[in-house]
């Protein structure tokens, strides 16, 4: 069963699920913006309102958490596959970055913890969709709209397809 949480603004979708995820459900949290979005090694993730996808999903597992050490790559591949079905050709940079035309378009953050004697995985995904090129970031980046001006982009469809693809990948 899915538990869906939608927010106008959160500090971080990953932090939200780490605090509130139910170990007996698949949980999906989506925010229109994040005030403390982050990537690996606590790098700040720019999260302007209404422009991108900021999502996290969580699930429990009976497996040891160490078995999920490469799940960031599996999750990046899930994002890649969803975009590929829309004729958007991305590349994956190990271990957790998604690139489009040699510029970063997204990232994955995997966090694990134990609650109620169940191991939980939180998969955070940030994907630049409508971000404009006046946003300052410390590396080359792009968004789907900057690269594909004439493409019709439905963020909700992308979110649902990514969530399904990631959860199918864990099986």
What are these model-predicted stretches?
Residues 45-47, 98, 115:
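Generic marker of residues within folded, mature protein domains
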Residues 63-64, 73-90, 100-171:
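Long, positively charged amphipathic alpha-helical accessory segments at protein N-termini or as interdomain linkers
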Residues 13, 55, 97, 126, ...:
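Residue-level signal for inorganic ion chemistry
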Residues 1-85, 106, 152:
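N-terminal lobe of the biotin/lipoate ligase/transferase fold
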Residues 32-34, 98, 127:
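Active-site metal-binding loops of divalent metal-dependent hydrolases
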